[in-house]
Amino acid sequence: MPVIKVRENESFDVALRRFKRSCEKAGLLAEVRAREFYEKPTTVRKREKASLAKRHAKRNARENARNTRLY
């Protein structure tokens, strides 16, 4: 868990902002959301495979768009 030390003469809002930023960098909220409900290993693999396919399709579409001639 991210820990911050409140500096001297630092307002609460600034310290809270620093804490939120450190939580975001650590990926804490995403981890909590992922672990909120149990997900079967087969479902995890299926979701990851689908996201990989989507990523590849997106990259291929970008490359094809770059290689097409506009005239």
From Swiss-Prot:
<feature type="compositionally biased region" description="Basic and acidic residues">
    <location>
        <begin position="60"/>
        <end position="71"/>
    </location>
</feature>
<keyword id="KW-0687">Ribonucleoprotein</keyword>
<dbReference type="GO" id="GO:1990904">
    <property type="term" value="C:ribonucleoprotein complex"/>
</dbReference>
<dbReference type="InterPro" id="IPR038380">
    <property type="entry name" value="Ribosomal_bS21_sf"/>
</dbReference>
<comment type="similarity">
    <text>Belongs to the bacterial ribosomal protein bS21 family.</text>
</comment>
<dbReference type="InterPro" id="IPR001911">
    <property type="entry name" value="Ribosomal_bS21"/>
</dbReference>
<feature type="region of interest" description="Disordered">
    <location>
        <begin position="43"/>
        <end position="71"/>
    </location>
</feature>
<dbReference type="GO" id="GO:0006412">
    <property type="term" value="P:translation"/>
</dbReference>
<dbReference type="GO" id="GO:0005840">
    <property type="term" value="C:ribosome"/>
</dbReference>
<dbReference type="Pfam" id="PF01165">
    <property type="entry name" value="Ribosomal_S21"/>
</dbReference>
<dbReference type="InterPro" id="IPR018278">
    <property type="entry name" value="Ribosomal_bS21_CS"/>
</dbReference>
<dbReference type="GO" id="GO:0003735">
    <property type="term" value="F:structural constituent of ribosome"/>
</dbReference>
<feature type="compositionally biased region" description="Basic residues">
    <location>
        <begin position="43"/>
        <end position="59"/>
    </location>
</feature>
<protein>
    <recommendedName>
        <fullName>Small ribosomal subunit protein bS21</fullName>
    </recommendedName>
</protein>
<keyword id="KW-0689">Ribosomal protein</keyword>
